[in-house]
Amino acid sequence: MRLDKFIAQQLGVSRAIAGREIRGNRVTVDGEIVRNAAFKLLPEHDVAYDGNPLAQQHGPRYFMLNKPQGYVCSTDDPDHPTVLYFLDEPVAWKLHAAGRLDIDTTGLVLMTDDGQWSHRITSPRHHCEKTYLVTLESPVADDTAEQFAKGVQLHNEKDLTKPAVLEVITPTQVRLTISEGRYHQVKRMFAAVGNHVVELHRERIGGITLDADLAPGEYRPLTEEEIASVV
């Protein structure tokens, strides 16, 4: 990779600005100042900007994050903090959420810079299952599981929801597995049967389950098995 392209990616600036910084003697390779923007970087090179090391990125990246409340899954929001706050990774701004959560919803968020991989999670034709732990305002009705298994009519929607699986844990806490990703779907499904979601926590996406060792705001790389489970 050319040095100016690498610096542009790392700093989030244009190639022209990156070239200016290089010519300004602010970039070193293996401890030596390099002023040639076209310098060919090799994987073993150590690059620094103003003395701060810059890590070269090799291949796509995949992480799971335990999202706390109060953060949005977009990578740039003028009004709210984003989940990128938690990711201490080079050029973290290149990562995106493979399946977003609302600002008040907690739990599993998958972050990647592999667009094809995330498409297999978010595309409706792949029917990727997601499991949520749901806390309800009122005790769940006896026939809710049956209604969800058949599909319910959401407000302002033409088609019924696809069959969903409801597991009752306590009268006001349930586990719901769905295979589509309509707008605010879980909250709207319970509204359709006369209940209200108080808390919502995503536990699973496809074959990837939130690591119980991750506290809110913590993240880790996905394992090879977890990455390969998204097909």
Swiss-Prot record:
It is an enzyme of class 5 (isomerase). The keyword Ribosomal protein does not apply. InterPro entries: PsdUridine_s_RsuA/RluB/E/F_cat (IPR042092), PsdUridine_synth_cat_dom_sf (IPR020103), PsdUridine_synth_RsuA/RluA (IPR006145), PsdUridine_synth_RsuA/RluB/E/F (IPR000748), PsdUridine_synth_RsuA/RluB_CS (IPR018496), RsuA_PseudoU_synthase (IPR050343), S4_RNA-bd (IPR002942), S4_RNA-bd_sf (IPR036986). One of its GO terms (cellular component) is cytosol. Changing residue 102 to N/T: Loss of activity. Keywords: Isomerase, RNA-binding, rRNA processing. Residues 1-68 form the S4 RNA-binding domain. The keyword Cell wall biogenesis/degradation does not apply. Its EC number is 5.4.99.19. The active site is at 102 (nucleophile). One of its GO terms (biological process) is enzyme-directed rRNA pseudouridine synthesis. Disulfide bonds: none annotated. It catalyses: uridine(516) in 16S rRNA = pseudouridine(516) in 16S rRNA. Pfam families: PseudoU_synth_2, S4. GO terms for molecular function: 16S rRNA pseudouridine(516) synthase activity; pseudouridine synthase activity; RNA binding; rRNA pseudouridine synthase activity. Monomer. Belongs to the pseudouridine synthase RsuA family. Responsible for synthesis of pseudouridine from uracil-516 in 16S ribosomal RNA. This is Ribosomal small subunit pseudouridine synthase A. It comes from Escherichia coli (strain K12). The lineage of its organism: Bacteria, Pseudomonadati, Pseudomonadota, Gammaproteobacteria, Enterobacterales.
